[in-house]
Amino acid sequence: MKTFFNYLLLFTFAITISSCATSKAIFATGVNVDKYEYVVFGDKSTGDRELDDVVMMVQNEISNTKLTVISSTEANRLIANGKYVLSPHINVKSEKWDGGHTYITINFHDFDTNQSIAVIKSSGIGLTVSHDQNIALKSISQKLQEVF
């Protein structure tokens, strides 16, 4: 029984140290992200097409911020009225080998000027590829909530 408890403790410790998440946000100099209220999703995503489900989950996380999702037609109308609109370029990469790792990068551009406004990145490493993705997604979600 004591041996089982020791193995369980060791297994729990191994899981704890084997799961790791990081995230960061970088902003263009002089840009006030608070003035942006809207976001337009387009076809700006790169990476493995097998990861489109993760890209969709990232879009859902962006939708869960204070940003309102609109169409490009509506964006043009709002811009003409002095509103500011963002458009994200989403990149997801999952390493299936070498211990695995998932990286999510969102590059937010001003929809009107195409100026890079902010880059938000996260990464996750866990026990499986799916676990890596969930860790990276949770990390990017938290950073998005902080920024928007």
Give the positions of each predicted feature.
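Mid-sequence acidic-hydrophobic segments that form the walls
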Residues: 7, 109, 147
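Charged, low-complexity, helix/coiled-coil-prone segments
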Residues: 43-50, 76-90, 135-140
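A structural "domain/chain start" motif
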Residues: 8-11, 16-67
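Generic recognition of short, well-ordered alpha-helical segments
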Residues: 53, 57, 101-103, 135
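Bacterial N-terminal signal peptides that target proteins for export
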Residues: 1-8
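Alpha-helical context
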Residues: 30, 34, 38, 43-45, ...
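Surface-exposed short loop/turn segments
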Residues: 64-65, 70-131
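C-terminal/domain-edge helix-coil "capping" segments
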Residues: 21-33, 61-64, 115-148
